[in-house]
């Protein structure tokens, strides 16, 4: 919350199924006392081996009913997103086929469908700036900033774990020690919005929308719901009072309110 994130969906990376089930149960148990936690996102284990990124290949599985049922049972209603969900493209341009004029792949299919929300990691490393601009042009008002942040976020460079995999963080960039694959990020949404406005020249409206209203819409939290009760994503009557006060010059977070409670 020091960086202005008032609500979060916690991403769980591929692990042995028992570990993933235990992690889901932990998230579900935390939600009662932590209104900022909206649920869990499973990034795996149902991934293609050829596009596994920084996931343990030994833990990848086919989405057979037995495995799906175990995860759903463990989640007990807290599961908000799985990366294979057709309505959300997880971090566009990363861990997928790129654009090619004879092999268009998933990106054109996603941007052509107005129902699809497109996630994007705006750290200047996962996706270069010209491609970020291209993404916003392809899918206006459908880009959702995500961090893909791992344990090294807001911490010094060094050695960390991503699940059971060793990760080296150098200059803020996380890579697997074994093969150099990108292993998540150290990005915060504060920095993603700062980059969008100050470095990429996006309007404040577009940058803030990508970190607030668009993600809220993707999960159905832009309207009254059983989890947050009041809708999220706008400064408007009837919405939860999640508010940030930003420095007008640097766009750094100075004060944070969550559900009308001053946190910083």
Please identify what each model-predicted range represents.
Residues 48-70:
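Conserved phosphate-binding/catalytic loop of the ribokinase/pfkB sugar-kinase fold
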Residues 21-28, 68-72, 132, 193:
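Generic structural signal for well-ordered alpha-helices
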Residues 105-120, 135-246:
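His/Asp/Glu-enriched, well-ordered alpha-helical/loop segment
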Residues 1-23, 36-49, 66, 75-90, ...:
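Divalent metal-dependent hydrolysis catalytic cores, especially in the metallo-beta-lactamase
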Residues 66-157, 263:
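Active-site core of metal-dependent hydrolases
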